[in-house]
Amino acid sequence: MVYAHNLGFPRIGIKREMKKTVEAYWRGEISQQQLQQQAIELQLTNWKIQAEAGVDLIPVGDFSWYDHVLDMAVRVGAIPSRFKALNSNITDTMFCMARGQAPNGIETSACEMTKWFDTNYHYIVPEFTTNQSFELHHDDLFKSTKLALENNYRAKPVILGPLSFLWLGKCKGESFNKLLLLEKLLPVYAEIFEQLSSLGVEWVQVDEPILVLDLPPEWQQAFLTTYQQLNFFNLKCLLATYFGSLDDNLSLTCQLPVDGLHIDYCRAPDQLDSVLSQLPAEKILSVGIIDGRNIWCNDLNRSLTLLENIQSSLGDRLWVAPSCSLLHVPIDLDQENKLDVELKSWFAFAKQKVAEAAFLTRGLREGRESIGAELKKNEEVIISRKTSKRIHNPNVEKKAASVTERLMRRQHEHSIRKNKQTAQLNLPLFPTTTIGSFPQTSQIRCLRRDYKQGKIDDALYEEKIRQEIAEVIGIQVKLGLDVLVHGEPERNDMVEYFGELLDGIAITSNGWVQSYGSRCVKPPIIFGDVSRERPMTLRWIEYAQSLTTKSVKGMLTGPVTILAWSFVRDDQPRSQTAKQIALALRDEVQDLERSGVRVIQIDEPAFRECLPLRKAAWQDYLEWAVKCFRLASCGVKDETQIHTHMCYSEFNDIIEAIAALDADVITIESSRSEMEILKSFEKFAYPNDIGPGIYDIHSPRIPRVAEIEELAVRALQYIPIERLWINPDCGLKTRNWEETKEALSRMVDAAKHLRKAFSSEKTPTIDLELQPAST
């Protein structure tokens, strides 16, 4: 029989119960028993939603209090020694690995965090050593599976496959071949399968997303040997791939001794014919035809026609599913009561997407007429979106068509600009700054909420925001920071804020998705041509600058990041949408400069995450991404200093594109990786200024002054003294004021020590084992 199934469901809860519960636990307000009870309730709710929609096989093990990769590391005992020594409680150990701090007060340096493939979800990076051991360590998966079975759900446990798990981890200490760990790891996977089999499970979903990447030959070979060795203990294995095409990994994937294969049709429709021709006759094919990463309604008529053609070849060996886990979309469109009715009809969130998969499955089982009403209603929605006048703006399209190369060049090269900027800004050696946001207290969040709900008027809102800006400026001046920010109290999110002010973009009320841990974001929906009617940030920056003689940065989110962290229209190339956003930002940048703002930051933390997963497609993306940044930033005078910020980036393979952005200063996340990221600059002489993140803002742990100095000295191996900035890793929005003030105070003290040590009149007065880079 054709089955409808799902690869994973959002964890956060319809009302973000996960976030509220886990943060209450971190604060010591609830017990671990209460935490686990909430996990049970959230999972039962998720399973019920899917079962009622018509999903046949329900994913189990997709829930996590922080991250599924972290869960897998803990499950197989890949717990770094620094955590084992501090904590015997497995739940607190997990939180300590993620945050550097556990609810019981234990602190140490957190594990590294990075982006999950090309999504905006973050995972905790497993750490492996040459003497790494593994053992079955956590029974959460078995408890969840048993719970699902006891509640009469047909459970399909989901785990990250052994090769993807190793690939996504990093070697700690000396480098070595991670494949050597398979011999110790596979017996633990076998234990997992044995226990699942003993519970009476029929199918297990093993995720191996790295099969859509460019894999070295030894990793390709490792797939064959690994899956030949794995003992599934009579479980049927569905091997799940997603986010791209199998391409050169297709042949080996079809050879693996598994019972079924899931492919991402939405991201890689061209692979379907090759898959059908190579799939062994006995294997199931799960077609991910519902987009798990975007919010547009599926064209059910078109999808059903495609699936009917596949069914004619495969018969009952066809399964229907979303393209990937629905972790990346909001939970329920029914919770949106303020969206425009026509716009809302074009969308589908997780609850609606599993229903779409079930509709299509019923159509395959029982014939088109069985879902005739759904098909007719869906067809009307598809036509509505295609013909709506709100999609296209002739003025925007005309402006985009008139863009020339000249608009994407600064007046002079950076060396000339730097001299002018140095004269104007009068900055010291090792200038200090922050990335943008400052702590957002409950009072600020309530203020914005009351304003949106009409409970307070414009005048009171303006007064309160100005008070907050004045306080933030005063704190920075007192701390001794060199280039200031206004703190962004008016912004709930760095992308959503601009989404609210740009035409062609819709904002939801409850469209939350998980970014990392308990942090959730509400991505805007880009449904049409994007334009700016009026200045978006000008009044707040002008006010902030009026309070101090020090430079205050104008703060904008870049075109690629707005694109990456939004749900984007799928009826035109993403590059075209990015160009429209860049033009809107260019107008804002020029307005800021005209008002006297001397430093403007255009954040692009998503620049690298948007890279296609296959290198063959990189060049095209990098060309339009660089052009869009330059289009947004190059309309200013030499004296205006352009900053950009990037997170979680490995620069080695795109360093030339980073340089091509031609930002005067780039700040980057680097503290969790202990400045390893700066190795990118060993062979490439990056010409502009750099501010490597000098402490980790994602952890509540406050670094010592000596730690900050040590990281700065490491950075000087790669960055000339006169080009090094001192700053945190990222914005400070998620931290509290006590942590923030103390951490920034220590950062400023470290910068002062460095200036004294490296002043031209004196020999360095701190013990430096590392030699600074030359100019």
UniProtKB/Swiss-Prot annotation:
Check the record and name the Pfam families matching this protein.
Meth_synt_1 (PF08267), Meth_synt_2 (PF01717)
- According to the record, how does the cofactor bind? Binds 1 zinc ion per subunit.
Major enzyme class: transferase
Cofactors, names only:
Zn(2+)
Quote the InterPro entries the UniProt record gives: Cbl-indep_Met_Synth_N (IPR013215), Cobalamin-indep_Met_synthase (IPR006276), Met_Synth_C/arc (IPR002629), UROD/MetE-like_sf (IPR038071)
| Active-site annotation | 698
Q: Where does Zn(2+) bind?
A: 645, 647, 669, 730
Cite the binding residues for L-homocysteine: 435-437, 488, 603
Q: Which residues bind 5-methyltetrahydropteroyltri-L-glutamate?
A: 16-19, 115, 519-520, 565, 609
Q: Which reaction does it catalyse?
A: 5-methyltetrahydropteroyltri-L-glutamate + L-homocysteine = tetrahydropteroyltri-L-glutamate + L-methionine
Q: In which pathway does it act?
A: Amino-acid biosynthesis; L-methionine biosynthesis via de novo pathway; L-methionine from L-homocysteine (MetE route): step 1/1
Query: What Enzyme Commission number(s) does the record list for this chain?
Result: 2.1.1.14
Instruction: Kindly list the positions annotated as binding L-methionine.
Output: 435-437, 488, 603
Any one GO MF term held by the record is:
zinc ion binding
Show the Gene3D superfamilies listed in the entry: 3.20.20.210
Keywords (A to Z) from UniProt = Amino-acid biosynthesis, Metal-binding, Methionine biosynthesis, Methyltransferase, Repeat, Transferase, Zinc
Q: Look up the record and give one Gene Ontology term from the biological process aspect.
A: methylation
The family classification in the record reads:
Belongs to the vitamin-B12 independent methionine synthase family.
| Protein name per the record | 5-methyltetrahydropteroyltriglutamate--homocysteine methyltransferase
Taxonomic source organism: Coxiella burnetii (strain RSA 493 / Nine Mile phase I)
Taxonomic lineage: Bacteria, Pseudomonadati, Pseudomonadota, Gammaproteobacteria, Legionellales
